[in-house]
Amino acid sequence: MSKLTPMMQQYQSIKNKYKDAILFFRLGDFYEMFNDDAKIAARELDLALTARNKGGGEKAPMAGVPCHSAESYIAKLLEKGYKVAICEQIEDPSEAKGLVSREVVRIITPGTIIENEMLKDKENNYLASAICYKDHLGFSYVDISTGEFYVTQFSQKFSDKVWDELDRIQPREVIICKELEETENFADKKKQMNFVYNYSRIEKVKAAYNFLLEHFKTNSLSGFGCEDKPAAILAAGEIINFLKDTQKRTLEHINRITTYNLTDYMVLDSATRYNLELTSTIRGNKHKGSLLNVLDQTITSMGGRLIKKWINQPLIDRNKIETRLDAVEELVNNYLLLQEIREHLKGIYDLERILGKVSYGSANARDLAALKYSILKLPQIKKDLEQLNTKLFKNMHETFDPLIDLAGLLDRSIVDEPPVSVREGGLIKDGYSSELDELRKARTEGKDWIANLQKTERERTGISSLKVGFNKVFGYYIEITKANLDRVPDNYTRKQTLSNSERFITPELKEKEALVLGAEEKINDLEYKLFVKIRDIVRDNIKRIKKTAAIISKLDVLTSLAQNALERDYNRPRINNDGVIEIIKGRHPVVEDMGKGAFVPNDTYLDLEEERFIIITGPNMSGKSTYMRQVALIVLMAQMGSFVPADKATIGIVDRIFTRVGASDDLTTGQSTFMVEMNEVANIVNNATRNSLIILDEVGRGTSTYDGLSIAWAVSEYINNPDRIGARTLFATHYHELTQLENRPGIKNYNVLVEEDEDGVHFLHKIIPGKASESYGIEVAQLAGLPMEIIIRAQEILAELEKKGKESTKTGKGENKNISHKTESDLINNIHESDKEYLTKRNTNDKVQQLPLFKSEYRVIEKIKNKDIVNMTPMEAINFLFEIQKELKEKGENYA
């Protein structure tokens, strides 16, 4: 260390305190990184790796980024899971005696981002904690960009509930206890959710309790509802302690903590959120194609974040649901007012994140201008709320603070279009400060004198090319070309010689320069001081502004739901506690939104007694999965307070939705398709209650037919049994044997309507009572484009299996070993002559050809092949072509 240069000694002493972070060390206009940090930065950020003398004749690897563009580089490092410690110069280098003092002012981690450029407008950025305490587990999370802070406690230490909550909020970073890390599935879950984690450091509940009391400046946590929840206190205390260590400041905008219970909301585990595609799609993890994409017509960023919460946490209290629905209905019935409110919301910026920056002391004048524009809209919104009469809107109106005083302050003080920098003036309006006005007047007078100097000096000297200019090095000057140097007055003093001219000053010019530049410096300093005072006043009012912001967010979501109801013909659901779910002409909100044609609606009836377990049979691609998801989404939408895509809907409140939809090998955990499926089924039968809604799309497919059927049968009996679960269930299956369960109380058979005619099989996507007569698997394979050879061979095998099945029924034997084997040539010989040429072509790799689905196309081919085209007259040929075209159009086909 003694061999290091003073600057490198300073660097190393600071780096030793922050070994787990990449240290951005401020040197002038750059952040420099040294040694291993430099190597990491060069690799991850594609920077040039250079070197700097560190003393003792040795060089230290070095890489740097400009301060003005550092955010983009920091964002890339955070995305890759690194922490970044920002080390600033804390004194003016021009005033420093010796080495400039430096210290770390903030540690930026993935879960502690406040910079708008690194955040998505309509998504939260959470830091979470999951801490074990005795037989409980505390769970807490915060978004420091908005100030939202939540906490809860689980009665089971290693419950899957913690993983479901982590999946719901999708945190960027998690603080965990080592006990949780040692659980069997931790590594797999972390990999799936992709979060950075840190270890907890608080051992005593008392210490965590004191951290919270100190932060909230209170004597008790009773007002926050977590006084008697030690595990929750530990989890919340860990977050506050972490923020204290990393952010190096008090965060006034985190001024309350909300204690919640999972039982206050419908439970949606990670599998259900995934299968129902609530906020992102299964394929590609995209926003478009999700329920959120359909429902989110919010105008503000705050509303966008809130509607996502409502989707992920539907209500289970009937009164609360009805309160939301009343509000949405009132907006639906007041179209003009709805549009007026939405127009007013367009002027509202992201108040929550502006307050986060104000709390940090990083808000600039543009942030305060955005706050000003937003607050100036509030009186209009207050008047809008006054015109609404439902309970929720009345409460919102009564508690809505239009912040008139702050609006006046910001409107008087902050210019309409301020610069980004707060140190270079141009922030404060004329008339706000008399002292500032005097300085500006002096500056203006000085500049006017200097501006007139060029004219007066040209007249006085007779030098028409004389110029008055300014640069930062020499200040103001008079420039005269060399051809006119003999005419320079005696009171001019030479300042600088150029190739073609010389620059001079005069005593009067220096005096005015001192006045102007002195005034400029004083103006900039005074404007900054005034700005900081205004920002501090805003900081003192954070609680007030946050309450108003929360009302605006809720209003935005309610207007979004009302707008959706009007545009998409959604209707208000009736909510009950008796368990009846009745949907008339229900539609899938996402499929309908993305589809090109008219969506086929379906009815649904479920109750807790006579029709609680619905077995749905029918072919693949007929709409069974879409129908079941549709029912689940309609229930979820109703309980979040939304109108629903149905002509009528009665929703018996559901405490939890379970889905077991499809399955594939889980490569991250090494589990087979069948194991994944059985884990999901086990989760359902172990956690479902009588008030749950269960969606089962095939059970038992990943094993042998008899094993699968046996499991599906037993699971059906168990779920349907009121003494076990007795939950409302939709079960789609290809095991037609399960339809025999209809003789059990509570079980009903339904199937998808299929129409057969001379043109083939038509899937009508209509759910009707009764069991399916056939599976139509070969027809679906044909629709998918399998070669004709396979289709025809499958039909022959099916015929033989069905024949042997009938024979086994008579003889009591069920074996089907003697299925005939036929060669390709045998098959082709059995095909109708008119199709041989087509089938031969199908064996090529021509991907453009599509398998004809309907029999009408074969007849068209037959007609064309049998026609004596050579001997046809032109008119006969045209008429024949017209007949062919007409026939194809009537069948709705596009034959190529």
From Swiss-Prot:
Signal peptide segment: none
Domain of life the protein comes from: Bacteria
PROSITE patterns referenced in this protein's UniProt entry, alphabetically: DNA_MISMATCH_REPAIR_2
InterPro entries for this protein: DNA_mismatch_repair_MutS, DNA_mismatch_repair_MutS-lik_N, DNA_mismatch_repair_MutS/MSH, DNA_mismatch_repair_MutS_C, DNA_mismatch_repair_MutS_clamp, DNA_mismatch_repair_MutS_core, DNA_mismatch_repair_MutS_N, DNA_mismatch_repair_MutS_sf
Region of interest called Disordered, as start-end residue ranges on this chain: 805-826
Protein residues bound to ATP: G618, P619, N620, M621, S622, G623, K624, S625
Any GO MF annotation of the entry: mismatched DNA binding
GO cellular component, one term: cytosol
Biased amino acid composition, Basic and acidic residues: 805-825
Protein role: This protein is involved in the repair of mismatches in DNA. It is possible that it carries out the mismatch recognition step. This protein has a weak ATPase activity.
Family according to the record: Belongs to the DNA mismatch repair MutS family.
The name this protein goes by in its record: DNA mismatch repair protein MutS
